[in-house]
């Protein structure tokens, strides 16, 4: 058990701490006297200071913050993706045209009545 002196000392320390906290609170209240306290706004409430209202433009709070950020960041990425798809599609079209031309040229060569071009195959023929 504590003695009466120790209890009295503890009570005195607690009172001093409480007084210091009260003094700090009073100083903060005096400092913030001219400023209104910031309170959370509802969706429909917008706080405009009194006086010249044109000078202060009210920014509406972003209700769907994550959605807004995703779409703001996603737009350039989506644009790049679309450009890449267009570019890749164009490259594929060009390759398909080249392939079609080669296939047509080979098939036309087989069908055509023109004599084949001299390929020098007969020069290396070992027939007597």
Curated annotation (Swiss-Prot):
Residues 117-121 are annotated as: His cluster. The keyword Cell cycle applies. Residues 115-128 have a biased composition (Basic and acidic residues). InterPro entries: BEX, TF_A-like/BEX. It holds the Pfam family BEX. Zn(2+) binds at residue 125. It is found in: Cytoplasm; Nucleus. Expressed in central nervous system, with high level in pituitary, cerebellum and temporal lobe. Widely expressed in breast cancer cell lines. One of its GO terms (cellular component) is cytoplasm. Its main location: cytoplasm. The histidine cluster (His cluster) and Cys-125 mediate zinc-binding. Interacts with LMO2, possibly leading to regulate the transcriptional activity of a DNA-binding complex containing LMO2. Interacts with OMP. Regulator of mitochondrial apoptosis and G1 cell cycle in breast cancer. Protects the breast cancer cells against mitochondrial apoptosis and this effect is mediated through the modulation of BCL2 protein family, which involves the positive regulation of anti-apoptotic member BCL2 and the negative regulation of pro-apoptotic members BAD, BAK1 and PUMA. Required for the normal cell cycle progression during G1 in breast cancer cells through the regulation of CCND1 and CDKN1A. Regulates the level of PP2A regulatory subunit B and PP2A phosphatase activity. This is Protein BEX2. It comes from Homo sapiens (Human). The gene is BEX2.
